[in-house]
Amino acid sequence: MRLTQGSNAFLLGVLVVGLVVVLFLFGDTRSRRSVHISPEKAAAIEFSKWPTWTTVEPPDQRIRILWVLHDYVPFVNAGSEICAHTINTHLMYKPYKFDVWVASPGFPKRTFENVRCFDLHDQETFTQVLASAHQLHSHSYIYRKQMLFLSRITGKPFVEWVHTDNYVRSVGKQWNDSRLEGRQWTVFNSKSLRSSRADLPEATTKIFLPIVDYRDYAIDKEKKTPKYVTLSNVNDNKGGNLLIQLAKALPDMEFQGILGGYRKQIVYSGLPNLKYVQHTTRIKDVYATTWVQIMPSKEETWGRTAVEAMSSGIPLVVSSTPGLRECCQESALYCDRADLDGWVTTLRKLKEDSAFYNSRSAVALERARALDPLPEMEALEAWLEKEVAPSLRPGRLPTLLEKNILFR
């Protein structure tokens, strides 16, 4: 009797374990995430006007690009997401040549500014788009291994967009997958970041600066009410602590911090000359009230915010990272991140010397115009069409098992 009971218990245990394994491997048990859209957010982004779609039609002669991203605008408006969307919307100005899709966890199945978006965990839609795509793109390190795997089995080129020092450190020594046979492409956002991986082959490595069109951020003089020293994204790396120190040291000046979409935000209440505002898609409203833009970053590989601010003629005070030096050149004033007195002295000079302030405004605007992105975009289009596209190879789609465990 004991043997029978023990055998039954053993068999039951085997069945339970087997069921769990089957559900894990073949059931749709992946983690889910929904993008929460509050009524206020929906109104701000005019969500009700976003077209819905149901059909994944053939791309015909167009180059179909599939991005796989952990976040996307307008729900997260960080630099990488804005950069990807700017590229996508530009490519979609030529819908006869390019067709861009974005898969991101929880994203509603809608078209946002001509780019069709959907939930990464919508397995049926993902498979349909993947099957018809010609290129795979991503800047999300958390999906890097999955993208390399998909490129390997499908034969589709993988374009890897690199924006941060942390991304480079995370990849480590072994960057390229030799099994991809010339279809693994890497794009760095600056010369300084590219130099951190000088070992990568020139043939499959490019530099494309983040696209910021000064025309999109220019603010008419009559709409400007410059008042604040502004810091965008108040996490530790961007200088959230220094913003608080400056507000304490300069009680006669007004400061504002824009809450960012990633990393812990450093905030402080109780200072009458310091306020915080939510990050927004209406960033020109922020620049219209900005007197000086500060960027006391510990790491900054380029400086999209800097170019946006310069486009409005806003003087810049920044830390001396290689990326900010490359981006701003002589158009910014540089201070050591750890030198509070240096920041205080520089801001006081801008406040007390109007001629100096006006000259810094003029050189900022000149630099923004010098960074006209149109030639850069034309070069990107040609590269995608003439170099990346021909690297497409025959392949296969993921199996049911592979699809189910791919983005857990």
Predicted regions and their residues:
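Short alpha-helical donor nucleotide-sugar binding micro-motif in glycosyltransferases
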Residues: L130, H279-T280, D285-T290
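Short hydrophobic beta-strand element within catalytic cores of glycosyltransferases
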Residues: P315-V318
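Conserved catalytic-core segment of nucleotide-activated headgroup transferases in glycan assembly
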Residues: D199, D213-G270, Y276
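A charged, aromatic-enriched C-terminal amphipathic alpha-helix characteristic of glycosyltransferases
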Residues: A355-R393
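Conserved acidic donor-binding segment of nucleotide-sugar-dependent glycosyltransferases
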Residues: V234, A332-L340, K349-S354
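Short His-centered aromatic/hydrophobic patch
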Residues: S138-R144, V162
